[in-house]
Amino acid sequence: MEGGLRSPLNRAVRMAKYLLDSCIGMLPYPKQRCESFNVVDLLSTCSFYKAVSLKNLKLHIEQHPSFANPSLSHISKFAFTELPFHAFTFSIPKMSLDKQESPIPIVSNDKNIGIFESQNSSPNLSSHESTLDGNNMHTVSSEGSGAYAEHGPGIDHKIPQELEIQSKPDLLWSRVRHTMREPFSEFFGVFILILFGDGVVAQVVLSSGERGSYQSISWGWGIGVMLGVYASGVSGAHINPAVTFANCIFRKFPWRKFPIYMLAQVLGAMCASGVVYANYKSAIDMFEGGNNIRTVGLNTSSAGIFCTYPAPFMTKTGQFFSEFVASTILMFCIYALQDNGNLGSGNLTPLGLFFVIFGIGACFGWETGYAINLARDFGPRLMSYFLGYGHEVWSAGNYYFWVPMVAPFIGCLFGGWLYDVFIFTGESPINTPWMGLKRLMPGGLGSKKVDSKV
């Protein structure tokens, strides 16, 4: 008898599941209300009302006082004229005949659910392990685990999940954007940074101080960094290869992302410097003394608009140390602003970085121009070479060009190391045995326990 019922019962279950999915799919979740929804009648029409005891059909309605403890005698008829669809759940734990788990999806609004998108629900899931979201997407949950979506943990399940979890895009460009949005974010973050930074230098230099002063340059770079951080929040707003490198070392940022981040940052700087050049081309021609005259190192040279050049009295050691100190300050302050265990800055981090950059420029910018960023210096320098400034962009300052490419990496590493050693108590290689050196020496010192019997 039981075996004979199994095949019709399975067909009935599939039909019921299809009808349930259809009914749910017709709702433009979560705004539209369901005028009436008769669960028992729907099950009975699918020929397996007898197979499921009414006592096993549990209706749990959350966040609504009038349905907090519904009576089983009134379970067959109720109206949702006041109730949002996402506020109720129902479940059928098990089938009494074949003792198999119910394939009907269980809707759950538990707050600590790990979300992993899947097109097919697992057939061997127990109660509260299979979920159905607003897009009829079956999702598998693991009770107690963190909530994960496209950007990792942290879904607030008080918000309808359809607003938090985006399904895989169908359009070609949407798929490209979905995959490349972090590099795009870094590109435009640096683009905004250089657009404001080189723009303010161009205005001050080409107007011979009539439309700004040195402090204007500090303000412009600070604003550029602040707005660049706002524009590139999706990717973490590094906008500096040295910052990305330090995060790979101290904050477990994936090394596989470092090359594409660095490339996007350099390209963003190149494109922005090209826009600044196009905008000020007429003023550059007038300042240089004629059309297409481009010089480096003279009083009427405009090359300093795009990249940094050291003061004539600076030695090679002084050049390097100046960039090293400024980069160390930058990285130390970035980690301080991000550390919630310290005072932290939260959503005011971009504003805090504005003051950091303004302070570095106002106090440490005269000698070398405080590049503190490979992308900020190398990208515009390369663009200026292509625009006709010649090989002098590389040889000026006793071949200074390599200093703002190397010193920021060493300075940012040292700044991050200083903060983690003396202040930071969170997850960092510094806060592991041998300050992280043990990880770099598999089988080396301290990696194996010494047998006391030997």
Curated annotation (Swiss-Prot):
Residue span of motif NPA 2: 373-375
Motif mapping: NPA 1: 240-242
Observed phenotype of the null mutant: Leads 28% reduction in the vegetative growth rate but does not affect conidiation. Also leads to significantly reduced lesion development on tomato leaves.
InterPro entries: Aquaporin-like (IPR023271), MIP (IPR000425), MIP/Aquaporin (IPR050363), MIP_CS (IPR022357)
Keywords: Glycoprotein, Membrane, Repeat, Transmembrane, Transmembrane helix, Transport
Membrane topology classification: Multi-pass membrane protein
A GO term from the CC aspect: plasma membrane
An example Gene Ontology molecular-function term: water channel activity
Induction record: Expression is higher in vegetative hyphae than in conidia and infection structures.
Glycosylation sites: N299
Extracellular side: 208-216, 279-316, 373-403
Ranges per topology, Cytoplasmic: 1-186, 238-257, 338-351, 425-454
Pfam families for the chain: MIP (PF00230)
Origin: domain of life: Eukaryota
CDD domains reported in the protein's UniProt record: MIP
TM regions (residue ranges): 187-207, 217-237, 258-278, 317-337, 352-372, 404-424
Location(s), subcellular: Membrane
NCBIfam families linked to this entry: MIP (TIGR00861)
Protein role: Water channel required to facilitate the transport of water across membranes. May play a role in the vegetative growth and pathogenicity.
PANTHER family in the cross-refs: AQUAPORIN OR AQUAGLYCEROPORIN RELATED (PTHR43829), AQUAPORIN-9 (PTHR43829:SF9)
Family: Belongs to the MIP/aquaporin (TC 1.A.8) family.
Protein name: Aquaglyceroporin-9
Organism expressing this protein natively: Botryotinia fuckeliana (strain B05.10) (Noble rot fungus)
